[in-house]
Curated annotation (Swiss-Prot):
Species: Oryza sativa subsp. japonica (Rice)
InterPro entries, per database record: SCAR/WAVE_fam (IPR028288), WH2_dom (IPR003124)
Gene Ontology, cellular component aspect: cytoplasm; cytoskeleton
Name this polypeptide is given: SCAR-like protein 2
Function: Involved in regulation of actin and microtubule organization. Part of a WAVE complex that activates the Arp2/3 complex.
Subcellular location: Cytoplasm, Cytoskeleton
Length: 1334
């Protein structure tokens, strides 16, 4: 680089100039020194010196740069060296692992190859494949931690130098390090700290509990106790268990008897709390408390040698507490002695031997059953749970004091039992017997929402209660927060205690009691029960003195439990007859003497809330026996049946010689269905307004398990239909097999929804709705819940599912008739159910009181997928709506559909006649029963008349859409079949989808006529198709006069009995399935008279296919199913005296498809001209062309073609056709129809030519059919009020009915129809003067 531009200085000269100069002068000689001095003086450096300085400076700079570069290179190569070393080490480790794998792999391969089956490798962990091999880890992974983790260890500081403290420790060297590195040291320290905290917490909790109880006494209206409160009451439990020990833990309904829930220490600390309780009078409470507190400690062992142990879930409240009232008195009306005894029993049940940790989880024993506050403990698997270490630190002095107090309570209880229970009417003071009704109602109202959040409890064990014993009353008396009241007649005929109408006993779950006659072997037998199964109690309560105690039996079924207890008045026919006196004297609760006869118990589990209260005021009609129809519904929860996967519930319905009835179980998913009860005697049922029709008085009633229907409803707001369709839980659980002649049923196995059974309620019974104020009569309850008095017989025959008829049981075999425990047994597991609505039940109830008597007989065989539907699954909204609706008693509501079970239809005509209720268009179902009078059946089992009442369509002037049929006929009937707007009667409500949304489609129908078609139906006018395709033949739902739909009285339909039509529906108040025979139409165009008894398993009729509720079957699926189901099994019923089928006539023009408006004008024409036309046309066969034969005959299936041969028409008079019967059903013939048919024949003869007609209709087929399709909405509206019945004129008949006038919408449609008729007439040249419509 050029150095000229820079000032280059002498590096050496930068030093001291003098020194440098002096040194230079000395070194260079005198001459040189002179020159240098001269140059310095001159200010100019010598050039040579400058060059030397520049060279030295550059060399120094280069050397400095090289030194920096070398230092940087050293750093780089050092890092590279480290990476190389690390990579080499890892490579060596990988090589080592590979060698280890190569050594271990052969053994693994050998172990795998030795396996014979390799499918289990998918389900079995790999470690189990070769469990015998050595478990070596890290074959594929390095055992070293990652570097970032190792760095954290390397960077951390060294462990504390605890070894420095060893010289101060007596343990020697390493003691300190070992002590502080031992985990047990920290565990011990933690336990000590926790124990201190727990002790403080217990003391604080106890004080808070006392304060809380005091405030709860001051607040008379409190709800269910919280789990924290209940756990706080478990500080002192007992050390052992007895089977029948009962501990009453729940406070009273309105918080007035709190002493049951308080320990004795709490009583001592705050005796004023006891004085506030309504259980004692003031003096009795204080004196009793003082007597208890002034005693000395003693320990009283239990009679079986064990100290009592309060169960872990002693205070775990059930979902639905229930109060049982004796003879019309509520639980709050109890005398002081009764409640005092309950207090004593409660205080005696507590023992301070165990102190409970409040924070510990309280688990539930699988062998104990908790029904509200009654705890029945089994001795097996009894152990103390959740005992914390501090439980052992209880003060011994306090334990002795509490035990001594409990002993005194036991003694005092015995004194009270002997003195007080025999004098129910004696009360210490007047105020103690006072019941604040307002407080009770308010407390029930406030605690109602808490029913949804109650804790899960255990069901009831299989124990029987011996009601006549005195100790029973003492043991079962308690009060429950938000319980309903169930009333039982007094049942103390043979006991030392006289009947006390004002005394009450609380049956929270009808638990077993310490009856004195229960011996120790019986208790030990219960204790030895190895199965922790949940059993349902059968409370055998022989009842007498019903005249003295006409108290109603009220059941208010709470959130999610429902038990049914029926109290029959006599023993079973199939069981050993036991007189009432002996039955009452017998120790019913012992397993050796179990009787299904005197009483029965039906546990049922609804899914949603249902309030069913039946009140029997006719108890005075039956002296010495249980009032008929008394039923007790005990609420029960579905999800608490059992802890086992298949919940097992046992109901003690067994024969007298059956000793294992307490362990009979039924596997169900929440269903227990056992109901054996006796119906009323014949005379009593007549007094109650029930039509018995010769039913034996001892005919039992049984209720089988059904699946409930989950109802979605908008509570009938604004008159709308339900917002969501019902969800049908159709389950196919096997039914029970009942041994013939044996009274112990093997209960059904089902996972379906529960049911509610009532056994013969009377008209005077009342129903109390939770949120309503209006009682409902029990006849409505019977229909609401599906009360079907009678016996559902069990049948061993295939495809036979029977329901008891008035005087016989169909399909019942081997003498099981009358066995109240005989259940319906069918190979098809299910019974046909029906769906109805509340308004229909209310309407039909009114007509039932008019004396309409009918019975239900099931000709339908068992269906695989048909479930009974229960009315117990109402939501809370539905209940409120039900209460409000029933208050108004308006029979016009059709908004809230519900399900009614059709199980046993007995002689209770007053109640059962209302089960045949009318259905809304979206509620129509197949009802598998025909309602008939047995003495009036004809040869085909058809009743001569069935009069029903209370039309569901009383507000409408037209039949529902399901009862109508619209036929769309193309103009060219030779090339295509007619189209019917059909509701698929073959599949009518055999699917849950049809129940949800009845759909209609345009169904292609054949034009092949049947049996002397002549002109028998309206189809003769529209297409000359088969004569029996009209809906007048299917069922007489279509009448020409729409005023029939406005009739609400059953007597108004007697005028139509002249037609002698068994299928006539009075006010159309019954579903179409109530007819015995269904005339079906399939795709072949043939009418099928289907009897329910002719249907097989594969038929679609009555089968409720369990698709999902949201899936609506399409048209193809329905029709395919209909063809497969009905064509092979529904042959056409042919009369032997009728001739073969005539060829079909040609399709008439559109001008003949006139409306009813024209009929009123042309009706007045002379009948003489029409008679002449009839005479001239009756001998001529209808016109038939090969073209029509070619297109219409192949439509019929092969099996129907054999039944529909083409033959010459019947040449006899048409009067014979009008009077003939189809399978015993006489066809209704309208005189106007006959006249129109005659005119129709005349018009057909006057046609110029068949080919011309065919050509015109062929050219206009598409256009007219499309037009009809576009107008179907108007036609549907018209057909709701009008019916097309074009028939042939009959000279022997006179016009007895006048057509109704059409409304404005119909007039508009008629004008369009007339325009079409005129257009067709102008083309065809035909005359329509001789045509009219009906």
């Amino acid at each position: 680089m050029p150095l000229v531009r820079f000032e280059v200085r002498n590096e050496v000269g930068l030093g001291d100039p003098d020194l440098y100069g002096g040194g230079g002068g000395g070194g260079g000689g005198g001459g040189g020194g002179g020159v240098g001095a001269a140059a310095k003086k001159g200010g100019e450096a010598e050039p040579k010196a400058l060059l030397e300085g520049v060279a030295v400076a550059g060399l120094v700079g280069i050397l400095r740069q090289l030194g920096d570069l070398a230092e940087f290179a050293a750093d780089v190569f050092h890092d590279l060296h480290e990476q190389v070393i690390t990579t080499s080490a890892r490579g060596r480790k990988v090589l080592t692992r590979v060698q280890n794998i190569e050594a271990a792999l052969p053994s693994l391969e050998k172990a795998v190859k030795n396996q014979k089956s390799h499918i289990h490798f998918t389900y079995v962990p790999g470690s189990d494949w070769h469990a015998q091999l050595k478990d070596e880890q890290n074959h594929l992974l390095s055992s070293d931690l990652p570097r970032f983790m190792m760095d954290s260890y390397e960077e951390c500081r060294d462990p504390p130098r605890l070894y420095l403290l060893d010289k101060f420790d007596n343990a020697g060297a390493g003691a300190c390090s070992r002590r502080h590195s031992d985990p047990s040291y920290f565990k011990k320290a933690w336990d000590m700290m926790r124990a201190d905290k727990t002790g403080n917490f217990q003391r604080e909790k106890k004080s808070q509990k006392i304060k809380r109880k005091g405030s709860r006494l001051r607040e008379p209206y409190h709800g269910q106790t919280t789990p924290r409160q209940r756990n706080g009451e478990l500080q002192r439990a007992l050390t052992a268990v007895q089977l029948t020990s009962r501990h009453f833990a729940t406070p009273s309904t309105d918080g007035r008897s709190l002493s049951e829930n308080r320990s004795t220490s709490d009583v001592r600390s705050n005796p004023d709390n006891i004085s506030r309780s309504s259980s004692f009078s003031s003096k009795a409470r204080l004196s009793f408390t003082e007597q208890v507190l002034d005693t000395k400690p003693t320990v009283v062992p239990h009679e079986n040698g064990h100290d009592k142990l309060s169960n872990n879930n002693l205070h775990k409240l059930s979902n639905t507490p229930l109060h049982t009232r004796l003879n019309g008195t509520s639980a709050d009306d109890l005398g002081d002695d009764l409640k005092q005894s309950s207090l004593l029993d409660d205080m005696t049940a507590r023992s301070p031997s165990v102190k409970w940790d409040e924070k510990a989880e309280i688990t539930m024993s699988t062998t104990s059953v908790y029904c509200d506050d009654v705890v029945m403990d089994k001795a097996e698997h009894v152990q103390s749970k959740c005992i914390s270490p501090e439980q052992q630190e209880i003060d011994h002095r306090e334990m002795e004091t509490l035990e001594q107090q409990e002993a005194l309570h036991q003694k005092a209880k015995q004194l009270l039992v002997s003195s007080g229970l025999n004098h129910h009417d004696e009360v210490p003071s007047e105020t103690d017997n006072y019941v604040d009704a307002l407080n009770t109602l308010e407390s029930e109202t406030e605690t109602e929402p808490e029913l949804q959040t109650k804790s899960r409890v255990k069901p009831v064990p299989s124990l029987n209660v011996d009601v006549p014993q005195v100790e029973l009353i003492d043991n079962i008396v308690t009060e429950s927060p938000d319980s309903s009241v169930a009333e039982f007649p007094d049942a103390y005929q043979n006991s030392s205690m006289p009947p006390a109408p004002e005394s009450a006993a609380d049956f929270p779950s009808l638990s077993s009691a310490d009856a004195p006659d229960i011996s120790e072997p019986v208790l030990s037998g219960y204790t030895a029960n190895p199965h922790p199964e949940v059993s349902a109690i059968a409370t055998n309560t022989p009842v007498s003195n019903t005249e003295d105690a006409p108290g109603p039996l009220e059941i208010s079924e709470s959130a999610s439990r429902a038990y049914i207890i029926t109290l029959p008045n006599q023993s079973l026919p199939d069981s050993k007859e036991i007189p009432d006196s002996k039955a009452e004297d017998a120790p019913i609760d012992s397993p050796e003497k179990l009787e299904p006869g005197p009483s029965s118990y039906t546990p049922t589990i609804p899914i949603k809330e249902s309030s069913i209260v039946s009140q029997n005021t006719n108890a005075e009609n039956v002296s010495g026996d249980c009032s008929e129809g008394t039923a007790c519904a005990i609420s029960y929860s579905q999800h608490i049946i059992s802890d086992k996967p298949t919940n097992e519930v046992s109901a003690t319905n067994s024969s007298p010689d059956d000793t294992s009835s307490d362990e009979d179980t039924v596997e169900s998913g929440g269903i227990v269905e056992v109901s054996n009860s006796q119906p009323m005697p014949l005379n009593d049922s007549l007094e109650n307004g029930c039509a018995t029709q010769g039913l034996p008085a001892n005919a039992p009633t049984n209720s089988t398990g059904v699946s409930s229907v989950k109802l979605w409803t908008n509570a009938g707001l604004f008159g709308l239909e339900p917002s969501k369709p019902p969800v049908f839980g159709a389950h196919d659980g096997p039914k029970e097999d009942t041994t013939p002649g044996h009274t112990q049923p093997q209960l059904c196995h089902s996972t379906g929804c529960p049911e509610v059974h009532f056994s013969k309620p009377t008209e005077s019974a009342q129903v109390y709705v939770p949120n309503g104020n209006s009682p409902i009569t029990s006849s409505f309850v019977g229909k609401l819940v599906g009360i079907c008095p009678g016996s559902t017989s069990h049948s061993s025959e295939t495809n036979q599912s029977t329901v008891r008829t008035p005087d016989t049981v169909i399909g019942q075999t081997e003498g099981s008739t009358g066995c109240s425990t005989s259940f319906e047994h069918s190979d098809h597991k299910n019974i046909i159910g029906k769906q109805t609505s509340i308004s229909e039940l209310l309407e039909s109830e009114d007509s039932a009181e008019n004396g309409a008597e009918m019975f239900s007989k099931t000709d339908m065989t068992g269906r695989n997928n048909m479930n009974q539907v229960s009315a117990s699954s109402f939501s809370s909204i539905a209940q409120r709506f039900l209460a409000n609706t029933l208050q108004r008693r308006t029979p016009k509501y059709t908004d809230l559909p519900m399900s009614s079970v059709i199980v046993n239809t007995d002689a209770n005509g007053t109640d059962e006649s209302t089960q045949i209720s009318s259905l809304a268009p979206n509620e129509t179902t197949f009802e598998a029963s025909q309602f008939e009078k047995k003495t009036e059946n004809d040869t085909n089992g058809l009743p001569k008349s069935s009069l029903f009442s209370s039309s569901h369509y009383s507000e409408k002037s037209s039949p529902p859409l399901e009862y109508m049929k619209i036929s769309f006929h193309p103009m060219s009937a030779f090339e295509m079949s007619k189209l019917d707007l059909d509701f698929s009667d073959e599949n009518l409500h055999e699917n849950a989808d049809d129940m949800m949304l009845p759909t209609f489609q345009l169904l292609p129908g054949s034009s092949v006529p049947q049996l002397g078609s002549g002109s028998e139906s309206e189809d003769d006018t529209f297409g000359r198709s088969y004569s029996y395709s009209s809906y007048d033949d299917l069922s007489p739902r279509l009448y020409s006069n729409s005023e029939l739909w406005d009739q609400e009285d059953a007597n108004g339909l007697e005028d139509h009995d002249m037609h002698n039509n068994p299928n006539q529906i009075g006010s159309f108040g019954a579903p179409i399935s109530s007819f015995v025979e269904f005339e079906q139409m399939d795709l072949s165009g043939a009418k099928s008279t289907v009897s329910l008894t002719d249907l097989g398993d594969d038929n679609g009729l009555g089968t409720l296919d369990s698709h999902p509720a949201g899936e609506l079957p399409n048209f193809d699926t329905l029709m395919a199913h209909q063809n497969e189901a009905f064509i092979p099994h529904n042959p056409v019923s042919l009369s032997p005296d009728e001739g073969q089928l005539p060829p079909p006539p040609p399709l008439p023009p559109m001008q003949w498809r006139t409306m009813r408006q024209v009929a009123s004008v042309e009706e007045g024409r002379g009948s003489a001209a029409k008679e002449d036309m009839l005479e001239s046309t009756s001998d001529l066969p209808p016109v038939h062309t090969p073209v029509q034969e070619e297109h219409l005959l192949p439509i019929a299936p092969p099996d129907q073609q054999n039944l529909l041969p083409i033959a010459p028409p019947d040449q006899q008079g048409h009067a014979k056709e009008n009077d003939r019967k189809v399978d015993g059903v006489k066809e209704i013939s309208n005189p106007l129809d006959i006249e129109i048919r005659a005119s129709l024949l005349q018009q057909i003869r006057d046609k110029s030519g068949q080919q011309k007609l065919n050509g015109h209709e062929k050219s206009k087929a598409v256009g007219n059919d499309t037009k009809n399709l576009d107008e179907r909405e108007e036609l549907l509206q018209q057909i709701r009020s009008k019916t097309f019945n074009l028939r042939r004129t009959n000279a022997s008949k006179t016009n007895t009915s006048s057509p109704t006038t059409a409304n404005s919408s119909v007039v508009a449609i008629l004008e369009k129809a007339n325009a079409i008729r005129q257009a067709v007439a102008s083309d065809e040249g035909g005359d329509d003067d001789s045509w009219s419509d009906i």
